[in-house]
Amino acid sequence: MSLLRCRQQTLPSLCLSVLFLACFVASMPTESLTPTPGPENSRWSLVRARVMEMVEPLVTRTRDRWRWFWGPRAIQGFVQTYYEDHLKDLGPRTQAWLQSSRDHLLNKTHSLCPRLLCRDWTQG
């Protein structure tokens, strides 16, 4: 059970980290993703070149597919929808909650109070 709770607590931070990494990679110019030229006769440089051959098209395709998401319209639409769904009537909801909480607390206090001390003095 504690492992499940730990996973639920770390999931938002993991998602935020992945989102941050995606933003960072998407904002990098393509030139910075190409490897710096090194000695061509080294085996590691051949491996690095082969990996970059495979990874670079994948990164480019992913960036092109998700470009719409990073545009201002997508972010603006998300913020507007979030506001309309969650924040638009926050003031009236908060006032109603405070009023009902106060009434509930007063009723609870009144029911716990002895009749002699909390008697309604207006009725006589």
UniProtKB/Swiss-Prot annotation:
Keywords from the named record: Lipid transport, Secreted, Signal, Transport
Signal sequence annotation: 1-27
Keyword Membrane carried by entry: no
Gene Ontology CC terms: high-density lipoprotein particle; very-low-density lipoprotein particle
InterPro entries, A to Z: APOC4 (IPR028120)
Superkingdom in the source lineage: Eukaryota
The keyword Signal belongs to this UniProt entry's keyword annotation: yes
Main subcellular location: secreted
Cellular localisation: Secreted
A Pfam family of this chain: APOC4
Gene Ontology biological process: lipid storage; lipid transport; positive regulation of triglyceride storage; triglyceride homeostasis
PANTHER family: APOLIPOPROTEIN C-IV
Physiological role: May participate in lipoprotein metabolism.
Family per similarity comment: Belongs to the apolipoprotein C4 family.
Name of this chain's protein: Apolipoprotein C-IV
Organism of origin: Rattus norvegicus (Rat)
Gene from which this protein is expressed: Apoc4
